[in-house]
């Protein structure tokens, strides 16, 4: 072991066998990440729980009694945080988690193993929530190819699709929160969202790794379909 720049003991992984360098570096990063260790102590399924916690501590998005949709929810870290914040376990709020992958049960959370791109998904979500959502959130990341420009377009495309889904299930005044990666590719997405929401901004919680271009797009004050269409019509006159 060696100490890092903060004085903490740093774990190093010996190379050997068939372990690739990329795997070695990933394992070292996990072993030395304080958020990974804290997540285990706090019972969270992923370090991502602290990203949502920090964003919510700053912007007060999740409130008791709210209805929340968590897209690409597995393994469930964000759902755990949301359920606690809105009081889902005791029936005050509701959290519906969606993913193509299976996800272990989270107290108070309704899980649906489905593709949110399915045309029937918005209606199914409304049925599970008993109405519209106050917040649609997504910590999803697109599969990467290693080609930077292609990956950026894939990521933005995924967020655009999630935003379209959100526009079908959000209540007026609702919130959309989604992971993006810093690039010029999301400029048009920001423009579109500013038509649909009163406020759109980028936020980067401390739990996001400093060397990562990861950040979150936060859109609040959803105007709703009728208001959005009226504004668009006025712009064309």
Curated annotation (Swiss-Prot):
GO cellular component labels: cytoplasm
EC number, UniProt record: 2.1.1.166
Keyword set includes Transferase: yes
Subcellular location(s) of the protein: Cytoplasm
SUPFAM superfamilies associated with the record: S-adenosyl-L-methionine-dependent methyltransferases
Active site: 179 (proton acceptor)
Role noted for this protein: Specifically methylates the uridine in position 2552 of 23S rRNA at the 2'-O position of the ribose in the fully assembled 50S ribosomal subunit.
Protein name: Ribosomal RNA large subunit methyltransferase E
Lineage: Bacteria, Pseudomonadati, Pseudomonadota, Alphaproteobacteria, Hyphomicrobiales
């Amino acid at each position: 072991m060696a100490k890092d720049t903060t004085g903490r003991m740093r774990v190093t992984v010996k190379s050997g066998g068939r372990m690739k360098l990329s795997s070695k570096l990933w394992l070292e990063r996990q072993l030395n990440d304080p958020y990974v260790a804290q997540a285990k102590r706090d019972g969270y399924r992923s370090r991502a729980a602290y990203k949502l916690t920090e964003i919510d501590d700053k912007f007060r998005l999740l409130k008791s009694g709210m209805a929340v949709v968590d897209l690409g929810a597995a393994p469930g870290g964000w759902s755990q945080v949301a359920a606690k914040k809105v009081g889902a376990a005791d029936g005050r709020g509701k959290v519906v988690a969606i993913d193509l992958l299976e996800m272990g049960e989270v107290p108070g959370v309704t899980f649906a193993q489905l593709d949110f791109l399915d045309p029937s998904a918005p209606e199914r979500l409304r049925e599970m929530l008993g109405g519209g959502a106050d917040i649609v959130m997504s910590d999803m990341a697109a599969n990467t190819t290693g080609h930077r420009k292609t990956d950026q377009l894939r990521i933005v495309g995924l967020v655009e699709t999630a935003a379209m889904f959100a526009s079908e299930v959000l209540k007026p005044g609702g919130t959309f929160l989604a992971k993006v990666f810093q690039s010029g590719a999301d400029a048009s997405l920001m423009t579109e969202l500013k038509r649909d929401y009163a406020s759109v901004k980028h936020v980067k919680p401390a739990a996001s790794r400093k060397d990562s271009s990861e950040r979150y797009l936060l859109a609040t004050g959803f105007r709703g379909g009728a208001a959005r269409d009226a504004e668009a019509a006025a712009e064309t006159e």
